[in-house]
């Protein structure tokens, strides 16, 4: 019998022989020798290895489906003993090679989805672009600031809460055979920043008692002070602001949907006898911790009520909060860019969304002095983009870098109405248009199927060196009909540029036609364009001549999981461009001064 001990690196080799090689060298056996791979008792094997070793009559050893055994390495350091029960002594070297091949094979779990067992496993982070993920739960959304971190934060461990000796007894007797619940409270979402993780008690499992659950709610910015709040934190006095909601959360945590405050109140009275809680006399729904716990997370009441003050303050990069989003808040956030004193810096350099964009089309043929000073979105082709820090009260979604923008065409509906009315011979030939893109509201869904509305907190646009140029031209196939074609190859969107919308800008919703025009490269055509608001006075007409108009283009793309891709087009319509189409206003941009 020959024994070979080889580590996973293949450097250590120990041989021992039982002295029967010379006696049985000339003898031939009909059975094939068996190669047995068994773990050494002292070694700790985390992955199982499997292979087939074939031994033919001519004493040639082969590994089935293994061509390059020596080139595949594993990261685990295990020791495996390969015992060969054979009568052929001269096959020892081949047996050791077979044992080494077994040690260098990939785990069956890694080879399950691959036909070739010798393919080197590439980690997902090598070929996958960088992603940012923000957990969303619509049931715990509050009005707070949004920040996203891509770093894995350490779990927050705190010292055990000092209680009386009787506090470790369970609140209720456990049922026989029922496992203790290991899930966290529903408001924590598994995030290390929301709630604190207690050190496990010896012999008590991971059961969360009611007083611990209330303490977690007091330390959660999603529930404090919305459902429960401190009245005197130094003395440990707190109040149940919404006792029904707290009892529902406790019932959801205990998997009891019929939980109410009356049932939970009986459990609270149990803590009176144990010396954990006390009822504050003369005040309803007010309780007090007998021994105030140490190292608790303090939630500021003003922090969750005023969002705008939060945006001006310095926040931690690893904090994650939920927000609610409405159409009015989106329009206010987009229009607050031009007033730098109202917007505070929030750096989201890795968040982008390419499927929903705002395209800004402006005609730089006019002089800069003739434009309104409020329309800072109108950027000429020679102007370099500036960095914009937008304080948008919206969550951040997951996306990748380097999104593309496609070709879009704006076509006038009336065939006889001219699209371009030239005011100068220079702009009549080929005026150029600058395109900018920013993300807009886009519907999405969570893991549990709840549909929510998300908004990226970064403005994306084209760099100054890669600005797409548009030609205001007349199609040859459409008689008397003008169109705006965004020509050129798709460009990657990576830079930042200031974008704002003027006061009183109408927001339009336009529908995409189901069938495109025939041709080799037919552009997408908007079925309608907008017209400036009705003129009330000469001063208003002069101001609105340079205002930025907004179009919203809805396009269905069922190829990507039936997602709706929304394009919002911001058009600057000076006197050089006439848009003679009636509009349907869905909302107006309001600017706070």
From Swiss-Prot:
Any one cellular component term from GO for this entry?
nucleoplasm
Sites of Phosphoserine modification = 107, 185, 191, 363, 372, 430
Which positions carry Phosphothreonine? 182, 376, 521
Q: Which organism is it from?
A: Homo sapiens (Human)
The UniProt annotation puts the region (Disordered) at 146-201
Q: How does it assemble?
A: Interacts with the LIM domains of LMO2. Interacts via its N-terminal region with RUNX1.
Protein's UniProt name:
ETS-related transcription factor Elf-2
State the Pfam families in the record: Elf-1_N (PF12310), Ets (PF00178)
Q: Which family does it belong to?
A: Belongs to the ETS family.
